[in-house]
Amino acid sequence: MSCICLDTNWFLKGLESPCPPDWTALSALFSENSDAFSLPRFPMQVHDVLLAYGIIENPNIRGVNRDLWIHERDWVYCCRFSAQANVPSLLTFDGVDTFADVWLNGTLLGSCSDVYLSWEYDVGHLLRTENTLIVYFHAAQTELKKLSLPERYAGLVPTISAARVFRTGYHDYCGPSPCLIRCGLYAPVTLRQAEPVALAEITCDTWLTEDGDGVVQVQLTWMGQADTPYAVSLADAHGTVVADASGKTAHGRQRLSLSVHQPERWYPWTHGTPTCYTLTVRAEKEAVSRLVGFRQIDISDRLLFRVNGMPVRMWGANLMHLDTLTNCYAPEKMARILDLAQLANCNMLRVWGEADKLPEAFYEECDRRGILLWQDFFLGCSLYSEEEDQLSLYRQEAEMLLRTRKHHPCIALWCGGNELYLAQEYQHPEAPVYGEKIIREVFPEVCARLDPHRLYYPSSPCGGSFANDPQCGDTHGYTHLWFVPGRAYPHFLSENCRVSTPTWQSMNQMMTPDELWEEGTYALTAHHPCEIPESWMKHTPNEGWLKLGPVEHYRDAETPQEMVYRVCAAHAEYIHEQVGRFRRGRAPWENSDIRHTNGHLLWRLNENSNVISFGVVDYFLQPGHAYYEMKRCYAPVFASVALDDHAGIYLTNDTTRTIAGTVEVSLFHLVKNERTHQMELPFTIEPDATARLCTLDEWGQIRKEQIICVRVLDKRRTLLAETIQPLDIERRLAYPQQVGLSMIASADTDTLLLRCEHYARCVSLHGDGFDTLFDDNFFDLLPGETKCIRVLPSPSSGVIYAETAYDQTIVSCQWKKEKEK
């Protein structure tokens, strides 16, 4: 078989007025004298090409889209390629965004209108030795105006929900404003030719028997001549073949099973080794491989996950598409995002129902890393048409997603989509739940038929007496706008959000100096009812100023740096308080070992535009204050303080082993600059458990200008966990303004050592570029302690800066590695 990736000789041309659907007119657009753009790489969407040629600026840098003319035009791609004529051939488009006609050598192959589908065409009878492929994209807004829905949906189902497009391009919820509508080819275009045979499709299922043996069931679909030999093998992580089979490509389709005695099991990386096996199909000189794994996932009605019988609490985040400018997959950028997810102790990511379709490479990366995925189908926060033509599209999308992705051990569950029931309750509480037929009939039927071993979950959120009921099913953290009964210890938060700015360096990329600040102090008043400057609001989509953390706990800002700190520290405080409570999992007065909260997925991990929004990793892949607080709160061994009627010291163990050691608790007085009280006590804690180790009752009344400090040490005196808990809100505390911060760099060991003479509130580190990453940042530092920070990845040279929230002194050190001999 021969598989040709059509990744060269591509051209793009924009049209000020539509071109007639005629091959002569279309091919003339790409004559020798054409002013079409030659694509420097492929795939590229229209914005990618225009940016590469300097026609536009990247609207994501400032979060403002000025080039609306792009989505008002038709755009045409052309590719010239060589192939073998007169052999069975299949032309496949893995990503078409969105409304396009496909022409080959003068023949219209068909029209594309669903961005989530791959499009395949039988072209063997049309191919020549030299070929011309043209893909004509119609302006999306023009096509949307042609859509109509039956009268019963009027005012309930928006037109955009009848179109199968990337919805995020049609609103500014998570991108620049006004919205940025993408267009073009965003994934590979391939030509498979049967010489004499080609593998048209491979699907596989894996499961474990009751005896613990592994089964891989493979279905192969062939094109071309029959009776060509093929071989299938399954290799373990070391490359050793543990099962194989062979046959001939008779009748075009075969189903076969491979068995593995007691295979190594796949675990999320926080609880074991994510062991993968490689399934390979060979015919003639070609080979196609898939990663598979063996694991048993059971999920209770309270969404407690058990992986291979082991309870696993899910601590993670929602993953956004990487860039609003393009859906072309960027593996290096995604690798950085996944690195940051693991650095933050995340074992689950949610693939959001309104985000973009991700390629096989993403799922393989999650397989290898041991990151579990909550996988939504592509529905989002809207009611939907239930007409038969629409239901057929949803069915096709679900079938394609399952056939191509179900073999991945990283996928924990399929979910019907994002906020269908919530959209009905919030927007149209008296209306029927249009779209319920999709999530209650279409999707579950497809899942039961194609992937019966994996849980299907109807919608996120759903369950209980109302859609967002925290006490049944999953919930989304809308407590910034709503009072939600039962919110303190929900079963599972599949979203939970607050808004903050990106890092200070990224803010300077976003705004001009005049936008960043006007002289004066910003305070919430009747005449200024917003917590952020008005000039920031055009960079804050979706009314983000209503969704800040507890900024009222912080001093009013007199500079833009102080405002950035105020907003970001409030976001971090929200995570500290909320996730700390969820990790404990039960109220202090409960005499039980039950942990009510089984998972928390922060909304959201990453930003796809440089805006003020929910992401804790900004557009330039810089983690902010809230990210590092999430990292600390997701630590497998986690210490926390509950300030209710008593000050309780808690320890949570989400590892797989029993832990014993010593906990040190002290009070640090900010004004006296000393510890006023100290205690030390032993502890032992089982896996998957939370324990209240003590209260501070024996110290009686405690002055609120003190800080509770907790350090957890194992029996070898190795630090396992630590936390710092103020006794009052920050605007009432007198943090030192001269802390005597010092920093020493050891580039050869990739570390920084920091010390201070007085309590240092929120030590922040940054390099002289955007590439410097630290394993901890935005942390408090006590006098007498040495903080060791790893630099990841370590630059060869540069300058690293450190500063604190209240001391205006900036400390710096040179970073230079010795050259390797």
Question: What spans do the regions from the language model cover?
Answer:
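Extended acidic/polar, glycine-enriched regions
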Residues: H125-T132, Q219-S300
